Amino acid sequence: MLNCQFYISGKQAFRLARVYGKVDVAVTDSPIILGSFYTDEEYIKTACIGEDGKYKNQLNYFIERRKAYNPAGRNQTEDEAKEIDVKVRAMLDKLGKHYVSVEGTLEGYDWIVEDVLIHLNKLTLN
């Protein structure tokens, strides 16, 4: 578990709130809902899930690991990180959070960009 998850999730929520309605897209590798995974405190889980629910038109992507694991700056071994992947997916499924699995490759990243652009075009047409 990361230390002080309440602070980490709160800081992320603040960053998103500052740009909400001012930009077309906000990209993060640390969505607020992920904070609910990294805590055992129910009030933090509830706050993260509630805050996440405020943001509409979300696109969520689960990046499948494809490159060599780099342990620098990590709190987990590769096997532990893979276990977390499984548990995070289970949490997202349990919460009914829609996400798309994408290969962690340049082609996968390009696909995400295209998908975001398609969704942006749909929003502007409506």
Model-based region annotation:
Residues R18-K22, K94, K122:
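Secondary-structure boundary motif
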Residues Y7-G10, F14, R18, A90, ...:
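Charged/polar, solvent-exposed surface patches and flexible loops
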Residues M1-K45:
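Conserved nucleotide-sensing/catalytic segment adjacent to the nucleotide-binding pocket
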Residues E42-L117, T124-N126:
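A glycine- and Lys/Arg-enriched "phosphate-lid" helix/loop adjacent to the NTP-binding pocket
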